Amino acid sequence: MLSGDIPPNQTVYLRNLNEKVKKEELKRSLYALCSQYGRILDVVALKTPKLRGQAWVVFSEITAATNAFRGLQEFDFYGKRMRVQYAKTRSDCLATEDGSTAPKEKRKKQEEKAAEKKRRAEEAQQSGPNAAAQSNGTGYQASRLGKTSQEPPAPPNNILFIQNLPAETTSMMLQILFQQYPGFREVRMIEAKPGIAFVEYEDDSQSMVAMQALQGFKITPYNPMAISYAKK
């Protein structure tokens, strides 16, 4: 079906997605990827046999959906080229199950939001002033983002230090975001230190572009990324 046959609307339909990706990771990755185009109301991805490899993203504005439609066509997502079109109707993303399950889905979303708030509170308690600046086994040391006036921020270089990541963030989620900018090399995460990561580019001018573009970007509705240069 040609996307041109369907009028623009708030919901984009994504297909040719990697079926091996777990449902929750898929939803989080799609949220992180699509949030740069506008405010997201919902991401729906089900693992039933008929709906594998597909997802729906509902934006608050048609213009946001249009930007995603244009920007994500053929995007390399978990090793497969994404196919994007507008949903036939908004109900395409809401009627994927029998209507009687709607209250259950609503309760599930409310529970997920409550769990996310709880995780944020726990992460805030665990993140002491030294958590982000300790040596971490990667050969780099995180800059402290000005937490102490005695320690100046690291000078520009090709490696970015990312903080305030939700605990469920994966390296693939970050790769999907940062590989959109020229010169991307790799993402490094530390299993023993959730919530932080290092992203390497070919040179400092390329890392600066990515930093400026993604500073404060929210991988989830509650976690704006804090980006600085890594200390070598």
Curated annotation (Swiss-Prot):
Cellular compartment(s): Nucleus, Cajal body; Nucleus, Nucleoplasm; Cytoplasm
Family annotation (SMART domains): RRM
Keyword Transferase: no
Keywords, alphabetical: Cytoplasm, mRNA processing, mRNA splicing, Nucleus, Repeat, Ribonucleoprotein, RNA-binding, Spliceosome
Any one annotated GO CC term: U2 snRNP
Function: Involved in nuclear pre-mRNA splicing.
Protein name: U2 small nuclear ribonucleoprotein B''
